[in-house]
Amino acid sequence: MRKLTRSPKKKENLSLTAQELFKVKFTGIQGKITFRCDTFLLEKIKNTLASQHLAGNYQYPNLSYFFRSALHAYQHGMILTYQREFNNPRKEISFRITEDLMTFYNALPMNSKTEILERVLGSYYER
């Protein structure tokens, strides 16, 4: 019987553009955040992303990328304009972030991380 073998893969010498380098750096995932988010806000974001994908706009390829972008914008000075709805149901959600964003997230006040993160998502969605 013949033994199956694999041929070695060829390594290509690829050069990255500045935009690709930023994207590679931004997607270097190091940590994970879990929190309880407003279900209605989450559904609005999901629906918007789905409609953008149907239109061919893949600026935010998935929900986690949107969350990372929102936290990154807040880290660089985005003003929080969104007011939380305390009576809306909550859903536990988690997403992965870069080491830089994890350091920033851990520096936020301990008792208000969930509130701040929800306001960050709402403010980023509304802009």
Q: Which residues does each PLM region occupy?
A:
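A detector of short terminal or domain-flanking linear segments
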Residues: 1-89, 96-127
